[in-house]
Amino acid sequence: VYRHINKYNNNYYICLCDDKPCGFIGEIDGDIRVCTDPEHQGNGVGSFMISEITKLRPHIYAKIKLDNISSIKAFEKAGYEKKYFLLEPKK
């Protein structure tokens, strides 16, 4: 994680909860990357970070796998809506 943030440090933000890192969010080529510490998941930290980065970069988007229900809920809570589906050949 830290190597990834260091490589794209102008595009990433660390979220603090009680002065300790509890998640990070960033953007690469318009695509949001977000991660919340498991101890803070389900407490609105993810949707808070999504809302805040959207204020800074209103034209970003998210690509989320259909089975990642918690991410879908966090983005919907932050005001995002489903727009497209990606279809891939069966493996």
Predicted regions and their residues:
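Active-site rim helix/loop that mediates acceptor-substrate recognition in acyltransferases
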Residues: 1-11
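A short, internal acetyl-CoA/4′-phosphopantetheine-binding micro-motif in the GNAT/acyltransferase core
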Residues: 31-43, 64-65
